Amino acid sequence: MKTTSSLTTIQKKIRLCQKCDLCITRKNAVPGKGNHNADVVFIGEAPGKNEDLYGEPFIGNAGKKLNDALENAGLTRSSVYITNIIKCRPPKNRIPNDIEKMMCSDYLEDELTIVNPKIICLLGNTSYYSILGGKEITKN
């Protein structure tokens, strides 16, 4: 059975994390958020400026686009789980490096294990390559 306390524990660990140098430059680590029993999980690259300020995923410009996409698909933020490959904003919004992705990989794995979604939507190149390693999703 999925428990809120398990995700709450992971979220606390993320907020206190000091595994890499991003903890020096961040304002807030940004754990995933949403329905702990979601059938659909969205995984982005990393927090942006607004996410870093408020500690919540996808609340800036990308969040507005995601909200529109969710609405068009008949979904709501409360029905899905939203997270990122890395949990802290890289300086100047640069692409996360391999060390940063590796340091956050256990957090993401734990989130996915607890939520156990039926569908995982990868948002952008970083999440695609981090999860699938560049493998083709479908063949024509």
Language-model region placement:
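Short, conserved active-site loops that position catalytic residues or coordinate cofactors/metal ions
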Residues: 45, 84-85
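Active-site and ligand/interface coordination hotspots across diverse enzymes
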Residues: 1-61, 71-72
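The first long alpha-helix at the start of the GST-like C-terminal all-alpha domain
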Residues: 61-80
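Solvent-exposed, flexible loop/coil residues
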Residues: 24-26, 33-35, 62, 79, ...
